[in-house]
Each structure stands twice: as C-alpha cells, then as structure tokens.
C-alpha cells in the first residue's frame, strides 16, 4: 500500500500577498538540497517576479484543454502521476478545472476542482505544496459575500484545509 503524501498549504488573506512566491522560494530551497521537486502548475498572473521564481525548477508541461471555442492550460494530472515526483507544486487549490472529464481520466468527473487533483496526487504518495486565499474557504463564503458583496464561485471544502499537514499564513 502506498503511503499518502503530505499537504502543505500557503494560505493568504487576498490575491497578490505572496503565496505563490513563498511556495516557489521553498521549492528552490528543497530542490537545492537535492529533493525531487516538480512544478505541476503555477499561475503567475502576469507577475514577472513570480515567473522568474519558476526558473531553475523542473516544470511539468501543461495540458491544453479545448473549452467553449478556446484553449485553456491546466495541470496534466496523468503526466504528474506518471512522473511521480517526491514533491509537486499545485497553485490555487480553489481553481475550477476546465474541460471534459471522462472515465479514462484520473480526474474525478463529478466536480473537477484543482483540490480533487491534489487528493489524487496525495493518494499516489506524492507530497503537494499548494496555495489558496482564505475567502475561498467554503464555510466563509456567506461571511465574505456579506462583507464584499461578491459570492465566491470557487470554494474549497473546509475538510481540505483540515487535511493539510502544514498551513503557512502569508500576509
């Protein structure tokens, strides 16, 4: 039986506080110490500093997914499972995965969220380092909506955060 991987989450209070940069900095430290680290998917949102921090780390090619007349790039879950790194970086836990989901895929068909991909990686014995903002926590959706006037459409069940082996706050 495969030992379940560990999950570390960089948790921030808002977009742009440095979660992804903190995750990438940790990845460089681990990689420099000889650990098998792979960038599964990192969203740089056009930020040069974030993009530069990906340099020097192995990066899994993204999967191009046709959707509503366009193409989107997503984590290639099957390739990640096949590569089976010791540690994989998976940015933005709350992200909704775009595209078709079928029985031949490792990705659950019922509700394709990036956190589902993280669970598949953990179940395969791969350690995952990820990021999320606090407003994406499912139990806070009503509070966030009341304060901001905007309901979060992409949420992460509280259990996912409870399942994390380590949570690091970034503010």
Task: Give the positions of each predicted feature.
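Membrane-embedded alpha-helical bundles that form conduits across membranes
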Residues: 1-5, 10, 163, 170-171
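Internal gly/pro-rich beta-alpha loop/helix module
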Residues: 130-171
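Loop/turn-to-beta-strand initiation segments
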Residues: 36, 84-87, 124-130
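Substrate-engagement module of ASCE P-loop NTPases
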Residues: 112-133, 155-156
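Conserved ATPase-coupling elements of RecA-like P-loop NTPase cores
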Residues: 92-115, 139-142
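Conserved nucleotide-binding/hydrolysis micro-motifs of P-loop NTPases
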Residues: 29, 43-48, 94-95, 128, ...
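Short amphipathic alpha-helical segments and helix-helix/interface helices
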Residues: 27, 77, 115-119, 157-161
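Conserved P-loop
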Residues: 4-76, 82
């Amino acid at each position: 039986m495969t030992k379940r991987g560990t999950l570390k989450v960089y948790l921030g209070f808002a977009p742009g506080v440095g979660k992804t940069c903190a995750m990438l900095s940790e990845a460089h430290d681990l990689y420099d110490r000889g650990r098998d680290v792979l960038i599964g998917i990192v969203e740089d949102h056009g930020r040069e500093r974030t993009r530069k921090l990906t340099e020097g780390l192995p990066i899994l090619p993204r999967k191009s997914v046709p959707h509503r007349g366009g193409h989107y790039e997503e984590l290639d879950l099957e390739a990640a499972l096949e590569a089976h790194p010791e540690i994989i970086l998976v940015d933005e836990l709350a992200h909704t995965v775009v595209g078709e989901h079928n029985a031949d895929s490792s990705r659950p068909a019922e509700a394709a969220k990036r956190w589902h991909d993280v669970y598949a990686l953990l179940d395969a014995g791969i350690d995952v380092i990820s990021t999320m903002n606090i407003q994406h926590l499912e139990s806070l959706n009503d509070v966030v909506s009341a304060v901001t006037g905007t309901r979060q459409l992409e949420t992460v069940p509280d259990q996912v955060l409870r399942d994390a082996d380590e949570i690091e706050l970034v503010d």
